[in-house]
């Protein structure tokens, strides 16, 4: 703690601030301790002219003052004093500090780095084969602030395995443990920040962007990381370039100017600028003078809070600025700490109280530490009192203190006495270290990084200077508050930065040129769908699925077959009822009048058998509707053809009898007529049916029909049907019936009817005509109709065939039986005498044939 005298002086200084006399702030950048921490801070900036004209290994002059660098140095000073005043981390020990100016230049930063590594109490770095017992002047180094400097000092300190904790260097390359084994940082790596930036672009649908980076290691590596992250998220970089540093030659300046003109003339509305402060300042300075149209600028952390960039005249017209800023704990006591020390530094009594001290050995090497720090006021530094990076400095000091606590095995009573800790011994306890700072628990991962949240910041202009407003947060995933964002557009609408419009539902991208973000939208055809919004090709549905045009999903195919409830089937069932009813009615009449001349002339029992066969044909129709099964497919053709063969064989016997009686001589007629009735007639029927059985058996064995599911016939359904494997065998199965029908037609077509007798030939002729018309029409209709309706076509053909035979042959006889019974005589049907009801059945077949 500060002593009572110092506290009194502090109170006096606050009540009676200095009157502009030189401060003694530069004298407070060094303090002795048991263990000393080195500090590298950008207290000033070197003149560009001095850097360009440097021809000797001398240091450039640092003239310009950096308020942020001084505040960060004071944050380290405050953290060390806090630790010394506590009794939990290093009880009984005091930390010291040795803070130097880097001038934001590697050339300048190397000198204090050499001082840090000099042997304690000297300015020399001796050459040894083994530095295990080497004790440098400092135990660890806090800083530097930039990746450019850390790349230089990091390798240097890593050779001696001296822990170095940066509070601002964020390059991903510094995570390489092989190259930088002793490097740590209290800020996340650039990869985290760039991941957040890529998520931001994806969140707002910006996939056509420009990416610019400063022409240094920081910018080049940042662009490389962003390119990979953008490609993985489908973000296209339309224009890419490096922004030269202020001292670059004209050729490099011309290249970035060309890139800016291309961006201005293209549809790109979003620019990622991953650059250092000076490069960003140079870029915006040129953009303002060139009147670049307003864009959305995604800023890197390096220039997002830069007063140098914010204060550019005309910067408000450059558009919307968004960027991610590391979130740390608030150091509420820090502003008061700064005010107190500035007031004390302005008090002559306090400066005198510091006492006379010897000039440090390093003063001859690096010169006065910060002469410009003795000429500032509170107003010069007030803008950066709440700078986000201040906490990173504070946390860096606490990380080293915690590692030293662990190395010394300190406890509440103190730290056990032992030999001074070497830097490499401290380093062993830095890996995967967990420590507390400002109420937060932090941890170094295996690469020496800490995991911290980012706040999404928006520049909101208030007068000539923007203020940073929180509009989101990133902690592995992005959360934005869109309503808080004020866009630069006139209607405050989110800018659109796309090469092509967003494809609609069910459309995929057909890429044009080299960029995947430039494309035409193509509709997905039926049977395919768009799986993801970024698809470049439609995904085909499975064979059991279907989809309409421009679909985003597939639907399960429903099985399609000739169902019982379909209108065509219901109509055919009505037709079946009619046909079956007529068959049963005719059969009943024939059985009732079985001994009458009309029934005997029609064949008697054979006529009844023919009607039974027609009834079975009607019933076989019921095998066609419904879901196909292997048994149904095998039974359909035989069970429909065999009964029809039985019916046609009885009609063939009628036709043969008529032909024999009408066209052959009486001797032949008498001999053959007996064979066409009685047992021989049944033998003919049996032979015909056996032939049909043989053909059907061959059809079923050689080419058995099978149940198949056709996934392509119907657009939205799976067609389940009985597939005919051979249409030739299918036709041969009809051969017996066709032959019988043809013989019937030939036997009756040219037969002359006798006056006064019933014309039996005419009915048979028209019955066969009905058969042929039905089945001849069936062939082209079956070939052209949809497969799902083919069973209905065959059902219709069978029923029409039955109805044709009934209408032409049986129904006229039923009409005579019911309404003209007077014609039911032997003379009219059989040609016998009055009362001869049996006619030819009495054995007088030959003579009756002659009377006909």
Swiss-Prot record:
Record Pfam families: 7tm_3, ANF_receptor, NCD3G
Keywords: Cell membrane, G-protein coupled receptor, Glycoprotein, Membrane, Receptor, Signal, Transducer, Transmembrane, Transmembrane helix
Span of the signal peptide: 1-20
Gene3D superfamilies referenced in this protein's UniProt entry, alphabetically: 3.40.50.2300, GPCR, family 3, nine cysteines domain (2.10.50.30)
Any GO BP annotation: sensory perception of umami taste
Cytoplasmic face of the membrane: 592-603, 661-682, 751-762, 813-852
Keyword match Membrane: yes
PANTHER family the UniProt entry points to: CALCIUM-SENSING RECEPTOR-RELATED (PTHR24061), TASTE RECEPTOR TYPE 1 MEMBER 3 (PTHR24061:SF435)
Subunit composition and interactions: Forms homodimers or heterodimers with TAS1R1 and TAS1R2.
Listed name of the protein: Taste receptor type 1 member 3
Organism whose genome encodes this protein: Pan troglodytes
This protein's encoding gene: TAS1R3
